[in-house]
């Protein structure tokens, strides 16, 4: 049944219907459409459109429809309804007769869909927050396992200074914490109810919009009906949060792809999360990580598509909005999936500790410590930097680590170098000197781990 057929003298073209209908996309809003409809029935009771008995019949009918269809969309999708709103209205009327027609008094699909989308975003954001927290816990588990596992830290993809795998995990925990906080910050925009705004200018029924908002779990109401039905900023906000978080997951994937490569050979991915080559039998490919990296671009596409969709629209509602759900659902589904898969990856990696440490040593990542040692011997940092550079060149020619060079050889470059230099050049010493807050020292890492553990324990 069409919700707007009374104005027209001809039935709509079937090709137009196929092009115009959105049920195949927005059927996912059934929980939210029913939640907002139940709230609306309660407000209609307040303004005496419905009796107490009628409201209860409608509410029970809606709950029954939800129970039958919330986990199985087959019946919904077999319908020829235009969208989830018209499907629900038709189903209610077919179930309880003319009483069902009263439910839509004073309400437009314009404020209805704006409300449903906010309700859906609130539900989805809670699920994503749980995924983020789970991934943080998986990083934390790895961080505790590898407090003493030394790996090279990189700048410009060149070995720079030694760090630990634990420290690397902590870096991603912090990125994910910002992602979680971004979602929490969105609640101020998702917590205002547009329902009661009507088509564009409000409703003539004297409804209590604040009470209506409370019924649905909103903390406040929108202030302007024209803006309320036009607003899709909250979709841009949540997709922006998704895009930033996916960028973090893409960087995580790139790190592990490199660590897994034959050139680095720091980690091994489990057979259960890798694939092979149809031609080259020796291959064990990190497809799972490459797909996370690739799917980042899909989420960017969802965000940019929403910007493009909205940029030229006049106030207020336009049919262009029908496409917003494609971008919203796709972007957030990918984000949630990638968070889940990232957790799977962290449960299926094995570190090659000796390879990691050897790479840190041969990368001369302790060169900065040698330069700082010379500064403490009274040499200016610039001269110390120059002397250390010369020693590194000599080490490379000898194919030795700095700590493997004998004292007489080192003294050729600076007579102030003494036997105590070796205690400064060990990678463990390099790490533990970085004892500033947030540094890589064993002490600071343990402090950070305890702080993260305490923070995450509040969500259990």
From Swiss-Prot:
Keywords: Amino-acid biosynthesis, Arginine biosynthesis, Cytoplasm, Lyase. GO terms for biological process: arginine biosynthetic process via ornithine; L-arginine biosynthetic process. Its EC number is 4.3.2.1. Pathway: Amino-acid biosynthesis; L-arginine biosynthesis; L-arginine from L-ornithine and carbamoyl phosphate: step 3/3. Its main location: cytoplasm. PANTHER family: ARGININOSUCCINATE LYASE. This is Argininosuccinate lyase. The gene is argH.
